[in-house]
Structures are given as structure tokens and as C-alpha cells.
Amino acid sequence: MSGDNAMKSFSTGMPWGVRLPGLLLCLLLGTLVILPAGPLAAEGSRTLYPEDIAGARANLEWRVSTYGDFVLRRTLLRVYAEAGEYLLLGSSAVDVPEVPDEGDILVYTPGVVTGPIGNTTIDGDPAFSCREQRAETGNEAQGRINDRTEELAGPRTIADPGDATPGDTIPDGYIPCFYQVPETGIYAVVFYGPAGPGEDYEGTPNGEIELKEIPDEQGTSVAMWDVTVRASLTSTNDIQGRLFTYYLTLFTGENDRPLWSVVYVVSSDGYIYEIDLRGMDPNGFVLFANRQGFLDSDGKRLYRDVLAKPGMSFQAQNQLMELQGNTNLAGPDFPIFFNRPATATLQALDIPLEPEPPQVSNFQFIGTDDNVTRVGAGGTFRFTSNVDGTYQLVISRDGTNFDPTNPRNAVLRGFVTEGVNTVAWDGLADNGDPLPIGQ
């Protein structure tokens, strides 16, 4: 987060406890609150900043710099669409005065974007460019969201695709660029700010939500943007729950500009998180979700915030290029939706529609010496999990305090797979002392 050179971590879970002779422990498997899938509103900046929302606006970024030396400061959007449907696209960075030729909206077909999330590679040319379509239609208003009224109204219908003449419905909306999807799949959508694709100039966003005109100095960011899926150019029915990303890089322009947006994170086992920013004031930041959070110097989960090293330049600190204590960032894992995800989108991502709660069975501890547990000798835990995921196993020194941050306890963490899992333990607490015989 650019505001305080820190990044914060959140986690939730449900403990599962067991008492064995000589051992007192607690096993934690991650669990989430389930939210039903279904539509809410349109897809884009009007979703993040709906009518009457409080606080400030954060612009969508596309820059060449990174967070943590590997998460590019560019929001690569993804949208599930079925053959014959239309993507309707608009941006406040299209045809901006002074720099009319740099802002653009691009669409890439399935399979063109490859590589690890956070540092992806675009291996081919775009299938669509809003700027090129504007040149073909000759409609200078096409693809540009001019103000808050047009942002909230969304895309107008198109009566004549040849010159992008709008229909009479949704008169307060913007005239969209449009792309008809040739095949069913997940498409990538890129928004370039007025500075173009190869710059790192952040501009000076004003953070205003109620924009009455295209804001100056968007730089490498976009204030108002929209990706709407409809069945046809004349339809007024938005097909929702289709748009997502694996991480958001956003920029308010400065601090004291709180954010109140809501997004939805879906884990690979089908649970849905509703994430409410609740007035967070980060300035420039990246938002993503993963299995591990932040990592300690030994690669284990940290369960704490991370801070930039103070000796670096101001910009390097803001972008967390090196972290105190040789801690690290684990990369993004899970998709972030702007509405509750549509069933078809989850199916395309191979995410189950009905999540299965994690359960542990057949829990055993096997000592190192003919199944005899001696002080300081340790042994192996064996248990069966019904799902893939992560675990935290806390061995309490006194049977009362199961705090994983207490160095007098022993904490084991890692990944589990569906089926039988084994976890080795050296018999020591986190402070290096042997744990005594349990009471």
C-alpha cells in the first residue's frame, strides 16, 4: 500500500481440537462464509462506486512497475462470454484531449494470456481494439465515458453497427465499443490510460466519485471503465457475474480518500468471500487473495502485516520491493468478482457450485521410538482430509493456550490434499524448547 508502505493480511478459520496422551493440540482448516451466487448490478467502475456510495474513487492501473518485485501494477480483467454474445466496452481514457491516441480498450481471445498470475505474458495480438473500431465507424463519441451520469447508466444499445449509431433506449448512457465473441470462453480485457501501455507515470487522480467531465491527468490509470456482456447490440439486459480479475491495482492519487467498495473472492473449493473495504485509505495498492497470505523468511505463513525496508527510495518502499525481516509476498490465487459470480463463470473456472466443508478424520500421532512419545523426540501426525487446502496444527504447552503466536507452543502449517496426510514434528516448541508431557 503506497500510503503507509505496508501490506495487511486477513485470515479466517474454524479450529478442530483433539486430546491425545501427552499431547494437547488444535488443528485449523480454513473455512469461509458461503454466499449464494447470483446477479446484483453491472460490471465495471459503476459496480465499485454505485450510486450514493460514500468516500473516494480509485483509478484502475496499467503500469510497467511492480509490487513486491513480481506483481505487475496492471489490472488484467477477464470475462466469461458465450459464442455470439457481445462485450460492450467504455473508458474515460479513450480519446482524451491532448493525448487522443494512447487510451484504448483491448480484448484478447482465450489462451493468449499465459504465465503466472501477477506476472502474465501476452503472447499475441489483440482480437479487438476500441481505438481501431472508432476509426472504422467514424463515431468520435464511441467508447468514451464522459461523466458520472454515463458511467451509472451504462452502455447504450447500438442501432447501426456500421457507424455505431445508438438506439433510443438508455439515452443517458455512453456509446460503447462492441466486440462479438466468436467462441465460448474466458477473454482478457485491458484498459490503457491516456499515457499509453508502456509508461509508469501515475498521473494525479482527484479521487472524486461524482465526475462531471473526463478528469485530467489520469496518466497510466482509468477513472471510469465498463465491461458489460449482453446477448445482442439491441438488448438492454446486462448479463452479470461474468467479469473478474485475479488482482486489482488501484490508485486514489493521495491519502485521506477512503474506499467503500465491495468485491467477491471465490476460493478454488467454491466458498465465496464478500470483501468490504470499509473506508480503507491505502492511496496506491494491490488487492488479491491467496492460500498463504504473507510468508516469513523460512517460507512459512506469517499471519502478520509486512513492512518495506526503510533504507530504500520512497517509490521502492511504496511498492514493497524489499521487506523487513526478509519476509515475502505469496502471489494471487483466487478470482475477484465485481458481482456475485454467475454459475456459468464458476463452471468455466472449474470451481464447484456447492462447496464441501473441510473435515478431518482418523487423527493419529505416531511416536519416533516404537510409537513411544519421548520428550523432545517428536513424531508424525497422520490424518485424513476430505478436501485439498491448508492446515494449521497448534500443539499447546498447557492445554489452555492455543495461540499460534505464542512461542511456547508448537505450530505446524502446510498444505493438505484430499486423502491421508502426514506431518512430521521434531518435539520442540517454536522457541526451540522441548514440550513437556501433557497434563
Predicted regions and their residues:
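N-terminal secretory signal peptides that target proteins for export/translocation
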Residues: M1-V18
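Bacterial N-terminal signal peptides
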Residues: P21-L35
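Long, compositionally biased, intrinsically disordered segments
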Residues: L40-E418, D430-Q439
